[in-house]
Amino acid sequence: DAVPDVRFRVGSIEATEIDELLLELIRTSDGRVAPHLHMPLQSGADPVLRRMKRWHTREAYRTRALEVADAVPRIGLGADIITGFPGETEADHQDTVRLVEELPFTYLHVFPFSPKEGTVANTLPDPVPQRVAGERGRELRALAQEKHRRYRASRSGEPSLVTLEAQGLRGLTGDYLRVDVEG
Protein backbone atom coordinates (compact mmCIF):
# COMPACT_ATOMS: atom_id res chain seq x y z
CA ASP A 1 0.00 0.00 0.00
CA ALA A 2 2.99 2.33 0.39
CA VAL A 3 3.28 2.48 -3.42
CA PRO A 4 -0.33 2.35 -4.62
CA ASP A 5 0.26 2.36 -8.38
CA VAL A 6 2.63 -0.62 -8.51
CA ARG A 7 1.21 -3.70 -10.21
CA PHE A 8 2.61 -7.21 -10.39
CA ARG A 9 2.16 -9.98 -12.93
CA VAL A 10 3.10 -13.58 -12.18
CA GLY A 11 5.06 -15.00 -15.10
CA SER A 12 5.17 -18.66 -15.93
CA ILE A 13 4.22 -20.85 -12.97
CA GLU A 14 3.78 -24.61 -12.73
CA ALA A 15 0.26 -25.79 -11.94
CA THR A 16 1.67 -27.64 -8.91
CA GLU A 17 3.00 -24.34 -7.49
CA ILE A 18 -0.32 -22.47 -7.54
CA ASP A 19 -1.85 -22.42 -4.08
CA GLU A 20 -4.88 -20.84 -2.45
CA LEU A 21 -2.75 -18.01 -1.04
CA LEU A 22 -1.74 -16.90 -4.56
CA LEU A 23 -5.32 -17.13 -5.81
CA GLU A 24 -6.57 -15.14 -2.82
CA LEU A 25 -3.90 -12.49 -3.46
CA ILE A 26 -4.99 -12.16 -7.10
CA ARG A 27 -8.67 -12.10 -6.11
CA THR A 28 -8.34 -9.45 -3.41
CA SER A 29 -5.62 -7.15 -4.75
CA ASP A 30 -7.92 -4.82 -6.74
CA GLY A 31 -5.81 -5.38 -9.84
CA ARG A 32 -2.43 -4.86 -8.18
CA VAL A 33 -1.68 -8.54 -8.83
CA ALA A 34 -2.77 -9.15 -12.40
CA PRO A 35 -5.53 -11.72 -12.91
CA HIS A 36 -3.29 -13.70 -15.23
CA LEU A 37 -1.40 -16.98 -14.94
CA HIS A 38 0.70 -18.78 -17.52
CA MET A 39 0.70 -22.49 -16.62
CA PRO A 40 2.99 -24.55 -18.89
CA LEU A 41 1.09 -27.61 -20.10
CA GLN A 42 3.44 -28.98 -22.81
CA SER A 43 1.03 -31.84 -23.68
CA GLY A 44 -2.43 -33.04 -22.75
CA ALA A 45 -1.42 -36.71 -22.96
CA ASP A 46 0.02 -38.60 -19.99
CA PRO A 47 2.39 -40.79 -22.05
CA VAL A 48 3.99 -37.67 -23.55
CA LEU A 49 4.12 -35.90 -20.18
CA ARG A 50 5.96 -38.92 -18.72
CA ARG A 51 8.50 -38.90 -21.57
CA MET A 52 8.98 -35.16 -20.98
CA LYS A 53 9.50 -35.89 -17.26
CA ARG A 54 6.83 -33.34 -16.35
CA TRP A 55 5.65 -33.09 -12.74
CA HIS A 56 1.94 -33.13 -13.54
CA THR A 57 -0.55 -35.52 -15.09
CA ARG A 58 -3.26 -34.52 -17.54
CA GLU A 59 -5.94 -34.84 -14.85
CA ALA A 60 -3.96 -32.96 -12.17
CA TYR A 61 -3.37 -30.09 -14.61
CA ARG A 62 -7.02 -30.11 -15.72
CA THR A 63 -8.25 -30.04 -12.13
CA ARG A 64 -5.94 -27.18 -11.16
CA ALA A 65 -6.77 -25.09 -14.23
CA LEU A 66 -10.49 -25.44 -13.53
CA GLU A 67 -9.93 -24.54 -9.86
CA VAL A 68 -7.99 -21.43 -10.91
CA ALA A 69 -10.73 -20.34 -13.31
CA ASP A 70 -13.39 -20.94 -10.68
CA ALA A 71 -11.43 -19.07 -7.99
CA VAL A 72 -10.61 -16.02 -10.13
CA PRO A 73 -13.35 -15.04 -12.58
CA ARG A 74 -12.07 -13.37 -15.75
CA ILE A 75 -8.52 -14.65 -15.27
CA GLY A 76 -6.27 -14.69 -18.30
CA LEU A 77 -5.04 -18.27 -18.48
CA GLY A 78 -2.25 -19.23 -20.86
CA ALA A 79 -0.13 -22.28 -21.55
CA ASP A 80 2.76 -23.61 -23.62
CA ILE A 81 2.30 -26.69 -25.78
CA ILE A 82 4.96 -28.63 -27.68
CA THR A 83 3.74 -30.65 -30.66
CA GLY A 84 5.59 -33.61 -32.13
CA PHE A 85 7.57 -34.61 -29.05
CA PRO A 86 9.24 -37.99 -29.72
CA GLY A 87 6.68 -40.77 -29.40
CA GLU A 88 3.64 -38.47 -29.60
CA THR A 89 0.90 -40.43 -31.38
CA GLU A 90 -2.17 -39.08 -33.12
CA ALA A 91 -4.19 -40.26 -30.10
CA ASP A 92 -1.87 -38.27 -27.80
CA HIS A 93 -2.32 -35.20 -29.97
CA GLN A 94 -6.11 -35.59 -29.90
CA ASP A 95 -5.97 -35.85 -26.08
CA THR A 96 -4.19 -32.49 -26.11
CA VAL A 97 -6.76 -30.98 -28.48
CA ARG A 98 -9.64 -32.18 -26.27
CA LEU A 99 -8.00 -30.75 -23.15
CA VAL A 100 -7.43 -27.39 -24.84
CA GLU A 101 -11.06 -27.36 -25.96
CA GLU A 102 -12.24 -28.09 -22.42
CA LEU A 103 -10.08 -25.68 -20.44
CA PRO A 104 -10.70 -21.91 -20.28
CA PHE A 105 -7.43 -20.89 -21.93
CA THR A 106 -7.36 -17.33 -23.21
CA TYR A 107 -4.14 -17.83 -25.20
CA LEU A 108 -1.58 -20.51 -26.04
CA HIS A 109 2.04 -20.56 -27.12
CA VAL A 110 2.38 -23.58 -29.44
CA PHE A 111 5.77 -24.80 -30.66
CA PRO A 112 6.86 -27.83 -32.68
CA PHE A 113 9.47 -30.00 -30.97
CA SER A 114 12.92 -29.28 -32.30
CA PRO A 115 15.73 -31.68 -31.44
CA LYS A 116 18.72 -30.16 -29.68
CA GLU A 117 22.10 -31.85 -29.75
CA GLY A 118 23.16 -33.22 -26.37
CA THR A 119 19.66 -33.38 -24.83
CA VAL A 120 17.92 -36.51 -23.56
CA ALA A 121 14.90 -35.72 -25.73
CA ASN A 122 17.15 -35.87 -28.80
CA THR A 123 17.93 -39.52 -28.02
CA LEU A 124 14.34 -40.68 -27.52
CA PRO A 125 12.91 -43.22 -29.97
CA ASP A 126 9.99 -42.66 -32.34
CA PRO A 127 10.68 -39.16 -33.64
CA VAL A 128 7.66 -37.40 -35.11
CA PRO A 129 8.18 -36.04 -38.64
CA GLN A 130 8.48 -32.24 -38.64
CA ARG A 131 5.64 -32.05 -41.17
CA VAL A 132 3.32 -33.85 -38.71
CA ALA A 133 4.49 -31.72 -35.78
CA GLY A 134 3.83 -28.62 -37.90
CA GLU A 135 0.32 -29.77 -38.85
CA ARG A 136 -0.50 -30.48 -35.21
CA GLY A 137 0.82 -27.07 -34.25
CA ARG A 138 -1.32 -25.34 -36.87
CA GLU A 139 -4.41 -27.16 -35.60
CA LEU A 140 -3.75 -26.10 -32.01
CA ARG A 141 -2.90 -22.51 -32.98
CA ALA A 142 -6.19 -22.24 -34.90
CA LEU A 143 -8.05 -23.53 -31.85
CA ALA A 144 -6.14 -21.08 -29.62
CA GLN A 145 -6.96 -18.17 -31.93
CA GLU A 146 -10.66 -19.02 -31.78
CA LYS A 147 -10.61 -19.30 -27.98
CA HIS A 148 -8.74 -15.97 -27.76
CA ARG A 149 -11.21 -14.31 -30.13
CA ARG A 150 -14.17 -15.50 -28.05
CA TYR A 151 -12.54 -14.35 -24.81
CA ARG A 152 -11.77 -10.90 -26.27
CA ALA A 153 -15.37 -10.62 -27.48
CA SER A 154 -16.65 -11.52 -24.01
CA ARG A 155 -14.55 -8.67 -22.53
CA SER A 156 -15.44 -6.09 -25.19
CA GLY A 157 -16.69 -2.84 -23.70
CA GLU A 158 -15.71 -3.72 -20.13
CA PRO A 159 -13.49 -1.24 -18.30
CA SER A 160 -10.06 -2.58 -17.44
CA LEU A 161 -6.79 -1.41 -15.93
CA VAL A 162 -4.15 -1.22 -18.67
CA THR A 163 -0.40 -1.15 -18.19
CA LEU A 164 0.98 0.99 -20.99
CA GLU A 165 4.16 -0.01 -22.76
CA ALA A 166 7.08 2.39 -22.92
CA GLN A 167 6.27 3.60 -26.43
CA GLY A 168 2.88 4.68 -27.72
CA LEU A 169 -0.59 3.94 -26.53
CA ARG A 170 -0.49 0.15 -26.51
CA GLY A 171 -0.67 -1.94 -23.42
CA LEU A 172 -1.86 -5.04 -21.63
CA THR A 173 -4.90 -5.52 -19.46
CA GLY A 174 -4.49 -7.39 -16.21
CA ASP A 175 -5.83 -10.55 -17.85
CA TYR A 176 -3.24 -10.25 -20.64
CA LEU A 177 -5.23 -8.79 -23.50
CA ARG A 178 -3.27 -6.49 -25.80
CA VAL A 179 -5.15 -3.23 -26.34
CA ASP A 180 -4.75 0.08 -28.10
CA VAL A 181 -5.69 3.03 -25.91
CA GLU A 182 -7.51 5.96 -27.46
CA GLY A 183 -6.50 9.41 -26.50
Task: Specify the residue positions occupied by each region the protein language model found.
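Conserved SAM/AdoMet-binding glycine-rich loop
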Residues: 1-90
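Hydrophobic alpha-helix feature that most strongly marks membrane-spanning transmembrane helices
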Residues: 4, 27, 31, 69-76, ...
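Conserved, mostly hydrophobic/aromatic
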Residues: 10, 39, 80, 100, ...
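Short, small-residue-rich loop/turn micro-motifs
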Residues: 40-45, 112-117, 175
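Glycine-rich, flexible loop/turn motifs
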Residues: 44-48, 120-124, 147
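C-terminal, non-catalytic macromolecule-binding modules
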Residues: 71, 90-91, 95-137
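Ser/Thr-centric signal marking residues that sit
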Residues: 79, 83, 89, 96, ...
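Terminal RNA-binding accessory module
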Residues: 112, 123-183
